[in-house]
């Protein structure tokens, strides 16, 4: 009787183990194909999703520049006289701070731009006391000062909105600006001038 029960127990354990190991490949938590986007990575190496989209082939192409941004795709397309020469991944304005759409043009270029609205409150030693603040809404704690967020290769298109180098978590996350990988922001920056048309579609 005891021997029979023990044999049944061992059989159940073996079957359970087989189901568990067979299921690991199908469970996305154990799949090598799992991609974690921004914020919580569930034990995966930290960092944004791999960029397999962005490229630049415009250095040897002549022609009038223009940019088309497609918010639904989170991509920017750079043209010279109608010829596509570059594509960039983006992170545009998050919900409630949406990037505007319409027809614009580059109104300012600033390679070392720093935001006057968004950044951190820091102490006298430069330590962050309150991160990610909007100075129009977030009160400044005593003994701190505002330090604006760097926005390299800034290309302003309207009011406080522009294209610039920034972090891309894999989804719309900005305060309204159009973030790009730094190497793409640099290529776009050197290829536009004030007046370059920028079309943003939804």
Identify the role of each PLM range.
Residues 2-202:
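N-terminal pre-domains immediately preceding structured catalytic cores
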């Amino acid at each position: 009787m005891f021997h029979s029960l023990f044999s049944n127990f061992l059989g159940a354990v073996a079957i359970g183990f087989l189901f568990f190991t067979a299921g690991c490949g199908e469970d996305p938590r154990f799949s090598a194909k799992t991609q974690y986007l921004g914020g919580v990575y569930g034990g995966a190496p930290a960092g944004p999703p791999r960029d397999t989209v962005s490229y630049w082939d415009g250095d040897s192409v002549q022609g009038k520049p223009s940019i088309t941004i497609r918010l639904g795709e989170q991509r920017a397309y750079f043209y010279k006289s109608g010829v596509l020469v570059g594509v960039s991944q983006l992170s545009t304005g998050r919900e409630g701070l949406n990037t505007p759409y319409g027809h614009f043009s580059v109104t300012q270029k600033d390679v070392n731009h720093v935001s006057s609205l968004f950044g951190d409150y820091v102490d006298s030693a430069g330590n962050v006391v309150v991160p990610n603040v909007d100075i129009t809404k977030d009160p400044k704690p005593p003994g701190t000062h505002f330090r604006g967020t760097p926005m390299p290769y800034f290309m302003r298109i309207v009011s406080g909105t522009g294209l610039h180098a920034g972090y891309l978590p894999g989804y719309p996350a900005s305060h309204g600006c159009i973030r790009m990988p730094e190497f793409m922001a640099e290529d776009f920056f050197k290829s536009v001038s004030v007046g370059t048309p920028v079309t943003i579609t939804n």
